[in-house]
Amino acid sequence: MRVDGRAHDQLRPVTITRNYIKHAEGSCLIEVGDTKVICTATLEERVPPFMRGGGKGWITAEYSMLPRATATRNARESSKGKVGGRTMEIQRLIGRALRSVVNLEAMGERTIWLDCDVIQADGGTRTASITGAFVAMVDAMQKLVDSGTWKQLPLNDFLAATSVGVVGEEAVLDLNYKEDSTAIVDMNVVMTGKGKFVELQGTGEDAPFSPEQLQEMISLAKVGIDNLIHSQKEALADVTLSFAQSVAEESHA
């Protein structure tokens, strides 16, 4: 039995609240159990200098935590004068993940900034950020479709992420903080709606793990991501038809 009573293949309750920040082109609050992240998407009519003149768009991300998102206060990174290594790694992961399902050429020379701010952390903050940032990004993109700037969403699939690991002797899905802190193996998995992998980040924290354990964790991750994408589709119900048409056209392009 897990510490919170869940089955080994069970996600924590997931809630996605769209349009959470009124000023942003796209936003949501994603809650995965007690982990809560505000995700915003901002449209910018330019690209970074290294992209200029290429005719392509760009997706980039920033990630941060409130000082009391955790059990003890963590100083803001701005007060330290630099972004920490963990934060930089997570920001790059979020950006890479979201770019994998976007047709950058179809964006034109525009940037979408994804800001993921953790307001309460109980494990899985980076994976919740990816799952929520996707929803915020879709809403921001839909605004350009609604305005006539784009004919369709420049997307080729849904995208979500979850954590898996080995706690005790059992492979489990969606680790909370207590489980993560005692896990023998910890892994983050990012996948598309078609079941393709975008990223696998796995570490034997306490001991090496077997190919059989790896396969079991991947199978659990697929179950979790299927459910997370179902939650995304429910949250995005009013843009699902437009999105489905975009995905179909991208798939046959």
Curated annotation (Swiss-Prot):
Gene3D superfamilies: GHMP Kinase, N-terminal domain. CDD domains: RNase_PH_bact. It holds the Pfam family RNase_PH. Its EC number is 2.7.7.56. Phosphorolytic 3'-5' exoribonuclease that plays an important role in tRNA 3'-end maturation. Removes nucleotide residues following the 3'-CCA terminus of tRNAs; can also add nucleotides to the ends of RNA molecules by using nucleoside diphosphates as substrates, but this may not be physiologically important. Probably plays a role in initiation of 16S rRNA degradation (leading to ribosome degradation) during starvation. Homohexameric ring arranged as a trimer of dimers. This is Ribonuclease PH. It comes from Brevibacillus brevis (strain 47 / JCM 6285 / NBRC 100599). The gene is rph.
